[in-house]
Amino acid sequence: MTEPWQPDEAMAAFIELDHDRARRRGYPEAVYCEGKTPGQVRSAALAIKASGTTTLFTRAGPAHTKSVLSVLPDARYDEDARMLAWPPEPPAPRGGRVLVVAAGTADFGVAREVQLTAVYLGRAADLVTDVGIAGLHRILARLDQLRSARVIVVVAGMDGALPGLVAGLVSAPVIAVPTSVGYGAAFGDRKSVV
């Protein structure tokens, strides 16, 4: 008699982690948890533990988090970012400072995910929140901080106007990260990616 098929165990055969990524590319492996079962994420965590590979688990829901922590109990978990990092201590920062700017408090979770990703990629990263264009004075009050950053990541929903505003104030590269929050009028659901 054959054993019943176990989808999570069968899926483990298809998980091919890139254990050499950090050396080859300069950044660690990441496991995108959304869309995976907790068992599949646990299988990935087991493979990571066996290899000792630095890894980020992103978009981790409560069941994913429980699965990872059952295998890697010392993994660092950030509820706002919905992310786990293992090993829990990030590398020493090197290179220029990253500034993550969140337009509104609804953008905070994505902004925190960006900040922690930068930290685990070995960059010093600061987070500025609730500086959307509805209160221009708030972003202008941070002008010195904006201008001292090596790169700026702007996380914004609504109409997505903040990245353009910030880019006009600084000489550093500005990366726009659209979110699906807000009720802006531009182009329906596609407003902040156009």
Residue ranges and their predicted role:
Residues 193-194:
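Conserved small/polar residues in nucleotide/adenosyl-binding loops
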Residues 141-179:
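Glycine-rich phosphate-binding loop
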Residues 1-75:
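Long amphipathic alpha-helical segments
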Residues 39-41, 107-112, 136-137, 156-165, ...:
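Short glycine/serine/threonine-rich phosphate/pyrophosphate-binding segments
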Residues 11-12, 20-24, 68-99, 103:
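Arg/Lys-rich RNA-binding interfaces used to dock onto structured RNA substrates
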Residues 83-85, 124-148, 190:
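Glycine-rich oxoanion-binding loops at beta->alpha junctions
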Residues 94-137:
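Glycine-rich phosphate/diphosphate-binding loop of Rossmann-like nucleotide-binding domains
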Residues 28-31, 97-103, 152-154:
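Short glycine-rich or small-residue beta-strand-to-loop segments that form or flank ligand, phosphate
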